[in-house]
Amino acid sequence: MMQQYQSNSYLFGGNAPYVEELYEAYLQNPASVPDNWRAYFDAMQNVPAVDGSNGRDIPHAPIVASFAERAKQGPIRTIVASADSDMGRKRVAATQLIAAYRNIGSHWADLDPLKRQERPPLPDLDPAFYGFSEADLDIVFNASNTYFGKESMSLRELLNNLRETYCGTIGFEFMYVSDQAQKRWWQERLETTRSKPVFTLEKKKHILDRLTAAEGLERFLHTKYVGQKRFSLEGGESFIAAMDELIQHAGSKGVQEIVIGMAHRGRLNVLVNTLGKMPADLFAEFEGKHVDDLPAGDVKYHKGFSSDVSTEGGPVHLSLAFNPSHLEIVNPVVEGSAKARQERRGEVGHKEVLPVQVHGDAAFAGQGVVMETLNLAQTRGYGTGGSMHIVINNQIGFTTSDPRDARSTLYCTDVVKMIEAPVLHVNGDDPEAVVYAMQLAVDFRMEFKKDVVVDIICFRKLGHNEQDTPAVTQPLMYKKIAQHPGTRKLYADKLAAQNLVPAEFGDEKVKAYRAAMDAGKHTADPVLSNFKNKFAVDWMPFLNRKWTDAADTAVPVTELKRLAERITTTPETLKLHPLVEKVVKDRANMGRGDQPLDWGMGEHLAFASLVSSGYPVRITGQDAGRGTFTHRHAVLHDQARERWDAGSYVPLQNVSENQAPFTVIDSVLSEEAVLGFEYGYSAAEPNALVIWEAQFGDFVNGAQVVIDQFISSGEVKWGRASGLTLMLPHGYEGQGPEHSSARIERFLQLCADHNMQVCQPTTPAQIFHLLRRQMIRLFRKPLVIMTPKSLLRNKDAVSPLSDLAKGHFETVIPDHEELNASKVKRVIMCSGKVYYDLVNTRKEREANDTAVIRLEQLYPFPHKAVAAELKKYPNATEIVWCQDEPQNQGAWFFVQHYIMENMTDGQKLGYAGRPASASPAVGYYAKHNEQQKALLEAAFAKLKGFVLTK
């Protein structure tokens, strides 16, 4: 079935323009199209138009073409239509033939270096399909709708030009692009050159040099470090020539910084031959020697690197992102890193910073994060002015090489059609075509600020890794590969056969490279060793910091009032919704000290004070502007707006004249790509408060790979710091298993080595101080905040303005009731919303012998603060940990041993909370209330079940 689908060229959505041109031909002359299409189009004429009319469709193509022709000819002249209807049909057929080659010429291009299959005949590309005979090949047709350089030419010449342009060793896909200017750009660039580059001898020698380097490194490592994993590039050596051309050509176009993301295949080759890592340093890693002293470290083919190289346009900074083995997950990280670098450069950022994504064919088609990341490409909050995509298409994914198993599309790149990115499929055995394709791709990206893909079809000489035996599952493929002499040799022989270089030239290059390897010298030339980039970030102030470092987060009352006045002042022409108008009015009262602050105002004053002090703030999420629970209202909407794209006002962008940027983005509906993007942004910009907010905390596990592989472990593996802040709405309020829990236990399980902070603040003053602490304290670690839902409007969860003008973030909040400490027999420790339920229950029960302590920071665990609070109650014999979550979830299993460390001999530790559950929460509201009542009673009742004694 899939083969039938692929064999019918009309059924591909990407070929819709081809069908449209066929329909245009039908409207001009129904007899000019095949019978089956004529019957289909005849039936369409009976379908009423959108306006209900039954008139016959009118062809647009002749009208458009006539205007184009008139523009070329200058003064209008009268053209007499031919009376020869057969000739008229042939003219239309010639136009159809041109359209067919532009649309599906890539299907017949010479792309596979292994030539495993004969190229099947495509009727659509055969003149006979359109009714042409052999005798018709010498008929001269108007060719003004092409860029072949002639106003007219014979059908034979036209056909040769089309085949040379669209069916050579590069196959082009661009006709699905909606923008006519982009389509014309491609047609002109390809047809004027017949898709053939004209390179100087020096350029050709340089290409051979890069192929020699690519092959030489792999062969050196293969013989010196036998059997060690390196994920060889052999079979895809043209990729190194492509990378070289990308960097050099982009540099000549004004690019000053390139951020690269790629998986393991060929990574070591890029490190040495593209970025200029010293071979001696790589060899040391193969031998188990490590320059860095990281708590965990990582394997060599995950490591990143940065360098500066010289190009015609000036120095270019190269940054290869660190990444895990989870394929394609680095894509959004690279985009976020590029975005941060672009914004540092201002308006020219898109021109000067270029993101480059290197993919494998199987992963590009198979991993969902690819689609999520592509969807960011043209959005306001995440667009980076177009990314360069290179596919190392070795036609196999581990052991899967049959397209019937690898994907459901013709090409592995078909996913990019969703954003109308053009694709250049190129035969890896034609290095000049690969380099030329890269030139075209760079030019397109710089011209149109859109993504573009270069798909290098090659092969994988060895197994998935060097310990694999691929012939076990791919015997036919690996027979072909065994007979292949290698791209370098093919190209060297070609240059020698053309008498461009001596016969021994290629072998001499091989020997020279081997000598450089033996000496451990640079092989990427020229690498700049002392270039200082003025846009580089200095991470030195953030090194060797402790979470206990002091941070003055208080803001004077006079400044708070000024900020409050600024963020509650709106333009007179702005008509607010009555509900929002009340929010703004209440915030003005809060700013004057006339009423206590709610959560939204605590956040706003934190943001306002930061941007006013020069710290940029970026907050993104699916409802970041308004807030999932309508508490934030960072973006105010004019109810009288007359245009959909106008009429909004952001008070936090109008705090002071020289303030830092405040950016709030309602994100696309994605967790994985958006969180990956924000991690990448934060890792490149330590001086900005970067926040990602989940719609509900429950949905954060849609980005679990980012949390596991980057946020929690990036520093101990790679030494990469990040101050990313996650806001995860969390709380048990009877909304069921999908809207209750941010899975706090999973974050706590990942905590070690002081790798991140997990906090659950319960007052507006606490969130104010916590957000400010994240910037003011020079300690850049991810911050995970379990934010409230019902507390956003809880009359007890408020703070006076004065609490923002004094104090700091309290990791532990003591009991504020006036208790007789000597009479306290039980101390209840808790975190989050349940605190308010507990104090209300205590009041109802008049349990004056019970103290309630709030743990606002769960990790790093605040031992000193906890110990100090417990010491206040010398006669307490029982400690109870109370939580909303089930026993196997929440913080219980994480905090119990920390609490035990701070207990005195003889004290007992008990648990009060929901029983263990496979689901985060019950779905029945009545059962939720029943459980909530039971856990509150258990917090004050006799200890039962699992009790620990110090």
Swiss-Prot record:
<comment type="function">
    <text>E1 component of the 2-oxoglutarate dehydrogenase (OGDH) complex which catalyzes the decarboxylation of 2-oxoglutarate, the first step in the conversion of 2-oxoglutarate to succinyl-CoA and CO(2).</text>
</comment>
<dbReference type="GO" id="GO:0005829">
    <property type="term" value="C:cytosol"/>
</dbReference>
<dbReference type="InterPro" id="IPR005475">
    <property type="entry name" value="Transketolase-like_Pyr-bd"/>
</dbReference>
<dbReference type="InterPro" id="IPR031717">
    <property type="entry name" value="ODO-1/KGD_C"/>
</dbReference>
<dbReference type="InterPro" id="IPR042179">
    <property type="entry name" value="KGD_C_sf"/>
</dbReference>
<dbReference type="Pfam" id="PF02779">
    <property type="entry name" value="Transket_pyr"/>
</dbReference>
<dbReference type="Pfam" id="PF00676">
    <property type="entry name" value="E1_dh"/>
</dbReference>
<keyword id="KW-0560">Oxidoreductase</keyword>
<dbReference type="InterPro" id="IPR001017">
    <property type="entry name" value="DH_E1"/>
</dbReference>
<protein>
    <recommendedName>
        <fullName>2-oxoglutarate dehydrogenase E1 component</fullName>
        <ecNumber>1.2.4.2</ecNumber>
    </recommendedName>
</protein>
<dbReference type="Pfam" id="PF16870">
    <property type="entry name" value="OxoGdeHyase_C"/>
</dbReference>
<dbReference type="InterPro" id="IPR032106">
    <property type="entry name" value="2-oxogl_dehyd_N"/>
</dbReference>
<dbReference type="InterPro" id="IPR011603">
    <property type="entry name" value="2oxoglutarate_DH_E1"/>
</dbReference>
<keyword id="KW-0786">Thiamine pyrophosphate</keyword>
<dbReference type="GO" id="GO:0030976">
    <property type="term" value="F:thiamine pyrophosphate binding"/>
</dbReference>
<comment type="similarity">
    <text>Belongs to the alpha-ketoglutarate dehydrogenase family.</text>
</comment>
<dbReference type="GO" id="GO:0004591">
    <property type="term" value="F:oxoglutarate dehydrogenase (succinyl-transferring) activity"/>
</dbReference>
<comment type="subunit">
    <text>Homodimer. Part of the 2-oxoglutarate dehydrogenase (OGDH) complex composed of E1 (2-oxoglutarate dehydrogenase), E2 (dihydrolipoamide succinyltransferase) and E3 (dihydrolipoamide dehydrogenase); the complex contains multiple copies of the three enzymatic components (E1, E2 and E3).</text>
</comment>
<keyword id="KW-0324">Glycolysis</keyword>
<dbReference type="Pfam" id="PF16078">
    <property type="entry name" value="2-oxogl_dehyd_N"/>
</dbReference>
<dbReference type="GO" id="GO:0045252">
    <property type="term" value="C:oxoglutarate dehydrogenase complex"/>
</dbReference>
<dbReference type="InterPro" id="IPR029061">
    <property type="entry name" value="THDP-binding"/>
</dbReference>
<dbReference type="GO" id="GO:0006099">
    <property type="term" value="P:tricarboxylic acid cycle"/>
</dbReference>
<dbReference type="GO" id="GO:0006096">
    <property type="term" value="P:glycolytic process"/>
</dbReference>
